[in-house]
């Protein structure tokens, strides 16, 4: 159960990060915004890899991190055709790396599933913020998505605390 101190720390951290994020969104260039999104993607992939793979699996983790960098770069500098080509290449690359691990004793595709899901879930979906920012009124679209997400998460947190199961 969260104490008042941890709740205060959560709010203070959120406010500081919100100020930095708002400065980048409103005053930063598209490239700075994309760099911030890329940093968030890399941190997210690092966490994803540590949760889903655990120790070992260096090839899969490296593959996921490399793809996590290429996807937002392609979204920033390329177009939809480039992104589609990169995703097709990425799927093939994941399977090729998997082929090197196959032995006659075992055939476990879970590492392929984890890499592909991580690639689609974190870098591809988060790169949509860059796509939104590139639109004519991109700043407004980015802010709308962020406000909807933040309000939804905050309401869920406090509704869960209020109506949640008391142990």
Predicted regions located by residue number:
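Membrane-embedded alpha-helical bundles of polytopic integral membrane proteins
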Residues: 2-167
